[in-house]
UniProtKB/Swiss-Prot annotation:
Protein name (database record): Nicotinamide-nucleotide adenylyltransferase
Family (UniProt): Belongs to the archaeal NMN adenylyltransferase family.
A GO term for molecular function: ATP binding
Gene Ontology cellular-component terms listed: cytoplasm
Organism from which the protein derives: Pyrococcus abyssi (strain GE5 / Orsay)
Keyword Transit peptide annotated: no
Length: 186
């Protein structure tokens, strides 16, 4: 049995992810889907929680009709590239092949001896979570870029409103981050 690894942030899950997963599912018996930056949420780059991203994936995979077994595994960032692959190995079941469109991820796994399949990217110009988040904030159409089940879920959790609030509060948030930390005197 061949098990593949596919890692993404899925902020949000979009049709490009589903096309990539269609390719991955066609190549292996089981798929481990690693949810990167699992510790991050409620920021412009990572607006959705890990649980919300898992729900999006479950719904989108069901909608796509993929029948093979898959595992969803949260992968918090460690920000240390040299040990990232051993870290991933410790967090997921054994796998045989890695699917990625990210050149750094490909290099790191190749250096550890893994077979890496650089998967085709599908309409990267618009099928990008960054572009989808930008459209959500700007009030531009985004719904055609994500599976219907994900559109419904984002509406259920008021995800667009969350993003717009984050964008509106960005200036004050940035000022707070730049303010000096005051240590209380005793």
């Amino acid at each position: 049995m061949i098990r593949g690894l596919f890692v993404g942030r899925f902020q949000p899950v979009h049709k490009g992810h589903i096309k990539a997963l269609e390719f991955v599912f066609s190549q292996v018996d089981e798929v481990i889907i690693g949810i990167g930056s699992a510790q991050a949420s409620h920021t412009l780059k990572n607006p959705f929680t890990t649980g919300e991203r898992m729900e999006m994936l479950i719904r989108a995979i069901e909608e796509a009709g993929f029948k093979k077994r898959y595992y969803l595994v949260p992968l918090p960032d460690i920000n240390f590239n040299a040990i990232w692959v051993p870290y991933v190995e410790s967090m997921v079941p054994k796998f045989h092949v890695v699917f990625t469109g990210n050149s750094l991820v490909a290099q790191l796994f190749r250096e550890r001896g893994y077979k890496v399949v650089v998967q085709p990217m599908f309409r990267k110009d618009i099928l990008s979570a960054t572009e989808i988040r930008r459209r959500m904030i700007a009030g531009e159409p985004w719904e055609d870029l994500v599976p219907k089940s994900v559109v419904e879920y984002i509406k259920e959790i008021k995800g667009v409103e969350r993003l717009r609030n984050l964008a509106t509060n960005l200036e004050s948030s940035e000022k707070e981050l730049q303010a000096p930390i005051r240590i209380p005197e005793f």
